[in-house]
Amino acid sequence: MGKGNANDEPLSDVTVEAKRRKLVGCKNFQRVNPKSDKFDIKRFHHIEFWCGDATNTYKRFGHGLGMPLAARSDQSTGNSRYASYTLRSGELVFVFTSPYSAACAQPGGAAPMPWLDAGRHWEFVRKHGLAVRAVGLSVADAAEAWRVSTANGARGVLPPTTIEDPESGTAQELCEVELYGDVVLRFVGGTFKGPGIAGYKAEAPPEGSTGFGLNRLDHAVGNVHDLLEQVNYMEKITGFHEFAEFTAEDVGTVDSGLNSMVLANNSEFVLMPVNEPTFGTKRKSQIQTYLEQNEGPGLQHLALKTDDIFRTIRAMRSASGGFDFMPRASDAYYAKLPEKIGDSLTPEQYKEVEVTRSQELFYRPWLFCREGAPGRT
């Protein structure tokens, strides 16, 4: 019997488990909620984008999505290291961050996140462009989330760190572990109840502002090379359970395909789908294209929940200049919709949104925007 290469590294538990697991597809998948979270995970807390110009980027997103500025940390607040802005609409919170020149940074100062490394930030932007750096999850105890997740194989990035909020007299505790690629999973706890990250200067919303009706993050989708290995890693460190799954047979076309699994926390308010490319189609999988353009795994898209999608769409179209919508489908597509989902919408409403069937008997109206940056999120 031949011997293995002495330099071969043993397979991790996650890799071994991934090799054993098989996708069954949407039709054969049976959803069960085992309430398996390994620590108390509540909801999405915030999403942080790393960008080259936080000032112009937050203004674009704020205008295009109807999300007013809720807090800032920049030179006007005494932060000489970086500019960072928080937008909020209901429970939906986006943070946009970019460093100032490292040569101008002053020691001490009012930087809520003094650990932010400008070199690492610019390397991230060079590779990924405008993209999501952190997916923040609200947890009961950030230190406990760190202890349990790292004990179960999470690759630590930032140990539990306390950020004081002078305005409210409260404090926030957060920590970070690797999620996929250069994206981190950020656990957020503590007594601070404001939006985003503590230590920022709160901003009052414009008088009479009602926004566009966006109220929370529905799900955050990642693209990876190996779906099962990634899913097993996420399940192992958090205890998340499988909420849904789709194979190329379910959601692919003759041109392009993908496999996808959706993970959820106990309450199923945190939904985190993960996609991988499939091969053998006429065209390259859109997931493979993303992985190439993003120079590796990353967060592909964010789904934003609204209680009135028609109001939101009309407001976004009226604002213009923020986001472009994907082209409408053909007339033949809309003509067939009533026989698929009934007459819950009028013919005019069918043309205003696109409808997708996520599961049998489960239909949701969607309207897709073009990417926020070429080839990225």
Regions picked out by a protein language model, each given a short descriptive name:
Residues G2-A71, G78-P159, S168-F243, V254-T377:
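Glyoxalase I/VOC metalloenzyme domain signal
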Residues D74-S76, E164, T247-G252:
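Short, solvent-exposed loop/turn elements at beta->coil junctions and helix N-caps
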